[in-house]
Amino acid sequence: MPKTFHRTDRVSAQLRRELGTLVHNAVREHGLPSVSVSDVEITRDMAHAKVFVTALMPERSAEAVAGLKELGYRLRMDLARAMKLRHVPELHFHYDDSVDRGEHIDNILRDLPDTLAAEKRREGDDE
């Protein structure tokens, strides 16, 4: 029976767990805006990893990502100590706006009944 998970999937899950802890500590130590690691995508050759983070305050997301990029080398060294990998991937931090987009869609759907009711009233007034 073939494996259902590739090594890159397992490594990216482990990176997500370890980086979650390291980023949490970095936020406290360096006064960065509060962020959490939402996903890690690793390249097939495991040389690069895209680290997606979400911020509690989306308006400060750029500041948080910039701070994490500055700390990238240190975080990579901490990962090397925590994980048993021959080569720790280079970290590339990105803001994950999927939560913001989901919230926007939720607001649209929540306002939809009011919009439809207003449209029906306008159609009734036109007749």
UniProtKB/Swiss-Prot annotation:
SUPFAM superfamilies recorded: Ribosome-binding factor A, RbfA (SSF89919)
GO biological process assignments: maturation of SSU-rRNA
One GO cellular component term: cytosol
Superkingdom, natural source: Bacteria
Gene3D superfamilies: 3.30.300.20
Keyword list, A-Z: Cytoplasm, Ribosome biogenesis
Pfam families found in the cross-reference section: RBFA (PF02033)
Compartment list: Cytoplasm
One GO MF term attached to the UniProt entry: ribosomal small subunit binding
Keyword Secreted assigned: no
Function: One of several proteins that assist in the late maturation steps of the functional core of the 30S ribosomal subunit. Associates with free 30S ribosomal subunits (but not with 30S subunits that are part of 70S ribosomes or polysomes). Required for efficient processing of 16S rRNA. May interact with the 5'-terminal helix region of 16S rRNA.
Family of this protein: Belongs to the RbfA family.
Subunit structure as annotated in this protein's UniProt entry: Monomer. Binds 30S ribosomal subunits, but not 50S ribosomal subunits or 70S ribosomes.
UniProt protein name: Ribosome-binding factor A
Species of provenance: Stenotrophomonas maltophilia (strain R551-3)
